[in-house]
């Protein structure tokens, strides 16, 4: 969601008013230009904050809906790994506000659609960053929630409950449901047998930003877990937003 107008006081949006007050209470941002740049599938919203030639991102994460602390925690982990993730400039955990460094507005998906020939270089950079996360993440992964059997079952259930049942109206009969549950058991068993690493959990083209230095910038990492080593690389190469010929994936 892109907004062209600067954010001002809004009698219908208490969160915007609080964010405005918090940002403008800092001497460096009293007269900053603040514009909403996006929202995501959660309750979080993001705003670009410009002051002179500098640009930052403010994150609004309502504390009753989202865990701002998990973003802060994982961001610090990634910073220690020298991975290109947003740095925390200022934080107000109680209110659910963070001020972050700005990684720009070009995500991998947009670049790949416009310039498919850039795929090789972009994916090589992404895989190098993923290797850093898995290698240096050994120090931090046990501090993350486990991607255990319970969580795997919950996420697999989304396929049937939301896609099959609600979205396309497909109801499984007894035989189909039995086969589906057997498939889930096999997938869960396979995942639990794999070596455990630091898992981003949404490592795909919309969460990777093309940057001039230390490409890619990595965002939307707050749901990181300790889980199977193949999870993130499959998210990247079997991206739900863009598909590649099998020969290219291999």
Regions found by a protein language model. Give the residues of each.
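Active-site activation/catalytic loop segments of kinase-like enzymes and analogous catalytic loops
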Residues: 158-167, 230-250
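Juxta-kinase regulatory segment immediately upstream of eukaryotic protein kinase catalytic domains
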Residues: 2-30
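Short glycine-enriched loops at secondary-structure junctions
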Residues: 39, 93-95, 224
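Active-site acidic catalytic loop and adjacent metal/ATP-binding pocket
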Residues: 43-50, 58, 133, 184-231, ...
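An alpha-helical support segment within catalytic cores of ATP-dependent transferases
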Residues: 19, 25, 138-145, 150-151, ...
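Glycan-recognition and catalytic cores of secretory/periplasmic carbohydrate-active enzymes
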Residues: 149, 153, 205, 225-227, ...
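ATP-binding pocket architecture of kinase catalytic cores
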Residues: 47-149, 153-154, 168, 192-193
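ATP-binding glycine-rich phosphate-binding loop
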Residues: 29-47
